[in-house]
Amino acid sequence: MRRKVFEELVTATKILLNEGIMDTFGHISARDPEDPASFFLAQKLAPSLITVDDIQRFNLDGETSDNRPSYLERYIHSEIYKTRPDVQCVLHTHSPAVLPYCFVDTPLRPVTHMGAFIGESVPVYEIRDKHGDETDLFGGSPDVCADIAESLGSQTVVLMARHGVVNVGKSVREVVFRAFYLEQEAAALTAGLKIGNVKYLSPGEIKTAGKLVGAQIDRGWNHWSQRLRQAGLA
């Protein structure tokens, strides 16, 4: 079972790179299906180089017995797994269309059925609230990342002010699906704001559409996996 998780993490990384969601500094993790007090995350490498042999195992304090280099931002993952037992996968990216919503006052809200999983709006973690305006804006310490997890609350995504995006979900595939459509939703909202008054999803539409779209996760995964094969990347 763990081997399957490793393979999904590698495939997910390739999909996110191929679809333009992840850049050089993104990373995705999965909770250990055999030990919920642990999670898997690749060693500190450029994402395009990651293989199943690069996966490290961490406890919920972000510690590992693996002596290879680890991402400093592993605490984003550990603190979310610690506070959200329902979460099985965590992704951190600098998703291009979403990134502007990390530094403007306009909230990121769903405007189409594909973005219903967002909820009524995406929370933003503001590091200045506790740490002032001379930080590196980085999620590299347990205390900062505990605050990120707190800002996430029970939602599916949180933005890090002037930095990036954190997606969570109940599976690797679900998180990839959500990351792709969060990017699409942000691009659609930005375009809509340039045209006229935006009509956002209602609470009822968010609830109902979210259930319908959530059932299509494997379809998305299969499509993006095929695109990898067509590109010679799988």
From Swiss-Prot:
Keywords: Lyase, Manganese, Metal-binding. Its EC number is 4.1.1.51. It catalyses: 5-hydroxy-6-methylpyridine-3,4-dicarboxylate + H(+) = 3-hydroxy-2-methylpyridine-5-carboxylate + CO2. It holds the Pfam family Aldolase_II. One of its GO terms (molecular function) is manganese ion binding. The active site is at E73. It comes from the Bacteria. GO terms for cellular component: cytosol. Involved in the catabolism of pyridoxal 5-phosphate (Vitamin B6). Catalyzes the decarboxylation of 3-hydroxy-2-methylpyridine-4,5-dicarboxylate to yield 3-hydroxy-2-methylpyridine-5-carboxylate. The decarboxylation proceeds by an aldolase-like mechanism in which the binding of the substrate frees Glu-73 residue from its interaction with manganese ion replacing it by an interaction with the hydroxyl group from the substrate. Glu-73 residue then provides the proton for the keto-enol tautomerization. Homotetramer. This is 3-hydroxy-2-methylpyridine-4,5-dicarboxylate 4-decarboxylase.
